Amino acid sequence: MRIAFAGTPEFARVALRQLLDAGFDVPLVLTQPDRPAGRGLKLQASAVKALAVERGLAVTQPRSLRLDGKYPDDASAAREALEAAQLDAMVVAAYGLILPAWVLKLPARGCLNIHASLLPRWRGAAPIHRAIEAGDTETGITIMQMDEGLDTGDMLLSERESIRSDDSTATLHDRLSALGGRLIVEALEAAACGGLVRRPQPAEGVTYAHKIDKAEAAIDWSRPAEEIERRVRAFDPFPGASFQQAGETVKLWRAAVAPQRGAPGTVLSAAEGVLRVACGDLSLDLLQLQRPGGRRVGARDFLAVRSTLQVGATL
């Protein structure tokens, strides 16, 4: 079976690796253009491109696939490459570009998407973040036959994954990426022998995982402690929950709910390795923090540097 692969970040790289290790023929890889990254803002290839180059695969990086869009030459070149590949199917995983109708119709078996939720819950761009933020206790992977809607296509395979009480987006991402890679291999192997059954998504239970905005990172101490703690885990590693202290933006990577109460944003404890801040109902112990340009440290090390942070201060 000849498969094109469209994906960009680490989540997609894991799936591509599993497809290649399973012996699938991948004549073409689509991924986002190289982007400036790091302190030097040097152009950096995506995780998918790095693997594709390592494995000697052909790569194309269109800025758009819309033939009538801003970059028609990119789209036309991609179309030529896809048509020449004589595809049986196309696998899409966190690609980052909208696929127009001509792409969806081109492969003989259409386009299959690896989506990191149990559809129809958490359609959209940030299903892992939003599941943790909402306090969901389980999520999963859905392999979907793509159509022109936003994650509305028929479901082909799905499998559940528990969300642990200490999961961050980073830890849950790693388990789901491995699960997604395994399920897409199973789906394609079943498709090759006619064993896949398409199931329409239920009309009930639809929710949308809107893209994460950096502005969401700012902690609102007036919110309930449990809600803030979930957001801390949901925004690890991006964009990182944060608060202002002494004119600096401090990122908070781990926290735990504590029973003490006080005015929201007030420091209730700042000694003996305990940094506790009042929230809208209870309070939070800030367990792992990061100053600008620094590394993640525990509360004790953070307080050793922040000697001016005293009980009664307001964040």
Curated annotation (Swiss-Prot):
Matches recorded under SUPFAM superfamilies: FMT C-terminal domain-like, Formyltransferase
A GO cellular-component term linked to this record: cytosol
Reaction catalyzed: L-methionyl-tRNA(fMet) + (6R)-10-formyltetrahydrofolate = N-formyl-L-methionyl-tRNA(fMet) + (6S)-5,6,7,8-tetrahydrofolate + H(+)
Disulphide bridges, residue numbers: none
Gene3D superfamilies: Formyl transferase, C-terminal domain, Formyl transferase, N-terminal domain
One GO MF term attached to the UniProt entry: methionyl-tRNA formyltransferase activity
Enzyme class: transferase
EC number: 2.1.2.9
Xref: CDD domains: FMT_core_Met-tRNA-FMT_N, Met_tRNA_FMT_C
Keyword match Nucleotide-binding: no
Positions contributing to (6S)-5,6,7,8-tetrahydrofolate binding: 117-120
Keywords: Protein biosynthesis, Transferase
HAMAP family according to UniProt: Formyl_trans (MF_00182)
Family: Belongs to the Fmt family.
Function description: Attaches a formyl group to the free amino group of methionyl-tRNA(fMet). The formyl group appears to play a dual role in the initiator identity of N-formylmethionyl-tRNA by promoting its recognition by IF2 and preventing the misappropriation of this tRNA by the elongation apparatus.
Name under which the protein is recorded: Methionyl-tRNA formyltransferase
Species: Methylibium petroleiphilum (strain ATCC BAA-1232 / LMG 22953 / PM1)
Gene expressing this chain: fmt
